[in-house]
């Protein structure tokens, strides 16, 4: 385990020599065209060019940031990732979204949902969010009359305007120095008490492009080789590897040869959901840097392996940076050359096309011609399947992070007619996660089945039937729960509730990361077999980290590099608060406590 002074010396040496390498560890994958779940072949990472940034900060911060920037390979044109700069806006963004808006249409019954779904399919509209109360849709202003003309009279006047000028919001969210302003009634950062800059880590000040994420992952592997590996879990259509952290450390003397109980956390299934990618990275950073300092986190990494995949859709994520900020699918070719891409969360093999997947490749929810038609889902499934067959992993938990709408969804997604056999456990943990989030930042997340849209009761049978604007079959959630028997499987839709949608401002990265990291700790507590009865919520409700006091649960790069006071570090490890509550009027819940 690196001591802070060791890390400082090593990274200073790195800075002056310009050399950092990390050899990917773990098992490789088969060629994506392989039709069978067979043995894997190793796959390596391509090298990245590294460039040094000019100093512009104080001496210690400059040294810290320069080391990181040199290792990550951030060129001068990309300094706006940490400090917004005057890069020109791609003209394609303006031409594509110049007249677009986002409408919220209220729905009241299954008939209205079905009518709206048909109109969306006819006009090839982009559904941003849908639930039992409303549907958020992106469309051009000139298409609004056509949409309303296809809807029943009951839906003619139930819409409200969420985003009036989408192209402007895209521009301001990517280039905040050019005048990005929060809505006056914005609630996305309320009750947090801090901004991303408080973390002191350059990486989480803003969203990061894929090459930077990859270099950052290599950096952490080189710093913490005792419990961190860099592995590949799949291959994309364009030939990129899908990188992941594998975290875990067996206690000394442990000779157990049983498969390691494993939790998998993924983000970025949909390319435009940048907050999901940043949140997976934040969770990984906390687990990695707290190992050996936080006894509960150390136990979690000793008892379980953790697979964290910032994005399972690197092709789409790169495209959302370079060409189209709101791109959703992967970049795989389809039967229509002008409509590429498959929706990765409709492409998994369990109950594929459960409720009539949109068959047109131009649909944002297009699931391909058959199950596992996408390169990414097929190769990830092969990797996960082989992990279980080779007795390397026993998947016990799965978190699939998305945005937006602040929901915690449990199986099944494809239908409400099938009740999951572990429903009681799923609901118990889901409500525990929701409570942890509420006590972290006072944000409310709704717990529900992933199948639920507008739920009605079928006459005669009494069965609950759900009607959705989007198809819900072929989800990663259902596949990991049913096929790999990951007992605690959830899809978590992150911030916000529609004010910004997929264009969530970057100052929400750290608050969102903290509340989901706390959720992971609750998940870990359940996996240790203690359920909800042992949770001590007092740690969340102001014990040592009330408003105005710095939360010590996040070890920043500043501390890793420059804090040489070992006694203070040991003391902070003993006295550490594992959850942050940063509002004076926190909930004073009784009963459970965490750890």
From Swiss-Prot:
Q: Which residues are glycosylated?
A: 386
Keyword Lipid biosynthesis found? no
| Chain residues in the propeptide | 23-178
Spell out the GO cellular component terms annotated for this protein, sorted alphabetically and separated by semicolons.
extracellular region; vacuole
Where on the tree of life does the source sit, at the highest rank? Eukaryota
Q: Name one GO molecular function term.
A: zinc ion binding
Q: Which Pfam families match?
A: Peptidase_M14
Question: Binding positions for substrate?
Answer: 270-273, 328, 345-346, 403-404
Instruction: Please give the InterPro entries that the UniProt record associates with this protein.
Output: M14A-like_propep, Peptidase_M14
Q: Can you list the disulfide-bonded cysteine pairs? A: 339-362
The protein's name: Inactive metallocarboxypeptidase ecm14
């Amino acid at each position: 385990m690196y001591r802070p002074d060791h890390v400082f010396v090593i990274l200073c040496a790195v800075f002056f020599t310009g050399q950092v390498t990390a050899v990917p560890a773990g098992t490789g994958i088969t060629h994506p065209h392989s039709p069978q779940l067979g043995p894997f072949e190793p796959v390596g990472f391509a090298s990245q060019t590294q460039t040094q940034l000019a100093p512009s900060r104080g001496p210690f911060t400059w040294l810290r940031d320069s080391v990181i920037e040199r290792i990550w390979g951030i060129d001068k044109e990309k300094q706006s990732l940490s400090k917004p700069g005057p890069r020109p806006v791609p003209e394609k963004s303006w031409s594509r979204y110049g007249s677009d808006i986002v409408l919220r249409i209220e729905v009241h019954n299954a008939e209205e949902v079905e009518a709206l779904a048909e109109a969306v399919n006819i006009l090839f509209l982009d559904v941003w969010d849908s639930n039992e109360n409303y549907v958020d849709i992106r469309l051009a202003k000139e298409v609004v009359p056509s949409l309303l003309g296809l809807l029943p009279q009951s839906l003619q006047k139930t819409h409200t305007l969420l985003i009036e000028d989408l192209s402007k919001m895209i521009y301001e969210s990517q280039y905040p120095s050019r005048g990005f302003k929060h809505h006056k009634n914005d609630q996305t950062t309320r009750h947090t008490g801090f901004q991303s800059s408080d973390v002191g880590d350059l990486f989480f000040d803003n969203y990061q492009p894929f090459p930077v994420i990859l270099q950052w992952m290599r950096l952490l592997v080189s710093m913490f080789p005792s419990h961190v590996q860099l592995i590949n879990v799949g291959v994309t259509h364009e030939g990129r590897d899908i990188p992941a952290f594998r975290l875990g450390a067996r206690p000394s003397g442990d000779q157990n040869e049983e498969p390691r109980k494993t939790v998998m956390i993924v983000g970025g299934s949909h390319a435009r959901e940048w907050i999901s990618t940043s949140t997976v990275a934040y969770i990984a950073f906390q687990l990695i840097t707290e190992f050996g300092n936080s006894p509960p986190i150390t136990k979690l990494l000793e008892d379980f392996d953790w697979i964290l995949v910032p994005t399972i859709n690197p092709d789409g994520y790169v495209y959302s940076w370079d060409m189209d900020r709101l791109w959703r699918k992967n970049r795989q070719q389809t039967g229509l050359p002008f409509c590429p891409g498959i929706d990765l969360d409709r492409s998994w093999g369990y109950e594929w096309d459960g409720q009539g997947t949109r068959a047109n490749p131009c649909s944002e929810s297009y699931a391909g011609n058959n199950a596992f038609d996408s390169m990414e889902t097929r190769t990830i499934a092969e990797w996960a399947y082989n992990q279980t067959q080779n007795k390397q992993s026993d998947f016990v938990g799965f978190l699939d992070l998305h945005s937006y709408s602040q929901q915690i969804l449990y199986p099944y997604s494809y239908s409400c007619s099938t009740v999951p056999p572990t429903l009681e456990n799923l609901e118990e943990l889901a409500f525990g996660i929701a409570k942890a989030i509420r006590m972290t930042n006072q944000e409310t997340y709704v717990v529900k089945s992933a199948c639920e849209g507008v739920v009605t009761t079928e006459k005669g049978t009494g069965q609950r039937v759900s009607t959705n604007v989007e198809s819900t079959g072929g989800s990663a959630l259902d596949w990991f729960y049913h096929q790999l028997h990951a007992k605690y499987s959830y899809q978590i839709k992150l911030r916000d509730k529609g004010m910004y949608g997929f264009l969530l401002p970057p100052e929400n990265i750290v608050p969102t990361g903290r509340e989901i990291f706390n959720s992971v700790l609750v998940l870990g507590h359940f996996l240790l077999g203690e359920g909800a009865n042992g949770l001590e919520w007092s740690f969340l409700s102001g014990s040592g980290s009330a408003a105005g006091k710095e939360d010590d649960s996040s070890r920043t790069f500043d501390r890793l590099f420059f804090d040489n006071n070992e006694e203070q570090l040991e003391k902070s490890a003993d006295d550490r608060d594992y959850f942050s509550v940063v509002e004076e009027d926190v909930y004073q819940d009784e009963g459970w406590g965490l750890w």
